């Protein structure tokens, strides 16, 4: 439970739009618990402001990735869950990115440079605003850390990331599909 890196997150309170991008190498299949990848924490909630994790899926090299977000902006308060299965992703270095564009209300997920899911959050969702920060967690869930970064303790069904993570990037804008593909092609 203490296998994580914690960073102060006060610089991302009002991201508005964002892109989270990283390379990951996790042995497949993912079993034994949901593996935390990244969290922008919320110290007063079970789930963070933004969470990305691998869900259990006993299907060889297919990744089951979930993205949770909660927006605290004026008219756009709301929790959102997005999930995607990406074939031929595990047991090798693979690239993942999620973008959110506040102007269009669109969230887009990418696997290995290709758009794999686009979700309309709606323009009422608006610019992203996060609250009650307790840092950024890399390689685990916010509630699995010691000390915990949430209002809750560890859960048996949740695990630290079993694998390697590289080139984690946070942008304060939604990168275009071409820019995401460039990150993948240039191994950034």
Language model: regions and residue ranges:
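Short surface loop/edge beta-strand patches of beta-sandwich-type extracellular domains
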Residues: 1-18, 80-86
């Amino acid at each position: 439970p203490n296998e994580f890196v914690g960073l102060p997150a006060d610089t991302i309170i009002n991201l508005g739009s964002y892109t989270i991008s990283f390379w990951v190498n996790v042995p497949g299949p993912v079993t034994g618990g949901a593996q935390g990848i990244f969290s922008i924490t919320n110290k007063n909630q079970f789930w963070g402001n933004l969470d990305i994790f691998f869900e259990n899926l006993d299907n060889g090299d297919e990744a089951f990735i979930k993205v949770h977000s909660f927006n605290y902006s004026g008219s756009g308060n709301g929790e959102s869950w997005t999930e995607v299965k990406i074939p031929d992703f595990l047991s090798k270095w693979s690239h993942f990115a999620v973008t959110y564009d506040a102007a269009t209300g669109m969230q887009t997920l990418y696997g290995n440079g290709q758009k794999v899911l686009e979700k309309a959050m709606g323009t009422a969702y608006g610019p992203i605003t996060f609250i009650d920060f307790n840092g950024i967690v890399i390689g685990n869930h916010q509630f699995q850390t010691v000390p915990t970064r949430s209002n809750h303790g560890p859960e048996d069904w949740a695990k630290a990331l079993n694998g390697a993570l590289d080139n984690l990037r946070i942008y304060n804008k939604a990168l275009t599909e071409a820019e995401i593909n460039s990150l993948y092609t240039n191994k950034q």
